[in-house]
Amino acid sequence: RLTDKIGDTYIAPMDTNRMNYYNSTLVEGKSVAIGYLGNLGSPLQSKIFSERKEERDFIFADAYDYYLTTPTNANFFDTKIPYSNLMYTTMGGSTQKEEQLKGTLTSNFGKKVNVGADLDYIYGRGYYNSNGTKLLSYRLFGNYISDRYQMYAYLANSNFVNFENGGI
């Protein structure tokens, strides 16, 4: 990750056993108090006002802040061997099933160049009529790190489809 102001890197040692890993997949694990429509991938907002980010120019994207990749939450890697992480979670019965497929693949080419890709696919059938969600986000990223120069870049795209039932 990069810092907000000048883009310095946060150094984080990779750990093979993440603590409270199951909380990273649940909506409730993103904050102490979250308001949302009940299924994975639906718009959400923190009920704690100080946790909310500054509003965007396109206000409808604010409810998807937890799903969007921004320069402040994009991860970059510097690995000695190729790294991959694949996660598949499923919740609920057949009529209300929620699924998430999330993956990262990255590899260094030489000592200075790293290239990788992220994928996040969420599909929720919904608990109510016309309450389904389908979110697809992907990102191609790379970085160049030498003694004198550092460059970080990524290209990301998100496609969110939510069915609306007019309120619960």
Regions found by a protein language model. Name each.
Residues 15-18, 28-33, 99, 121-123, ...:
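Transmembrane beta-barrel architecture of outer-membrane proteins
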Residues 35, 127-137, 141-168:
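Outer-membrane beta-barrel translocator/channel fold
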Residues 79, 110, 145-149:
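Outer-membrane beta-barrel channels and translocator barrels
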Residues 86-90, 119-121, 153-157:
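Transmembrane beta-barrel strands of outer-membrane/channel proteins
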Residues 84, 115, 149-153:
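Transmembrane beta-strands of outer-membrane beta-barrel proteins
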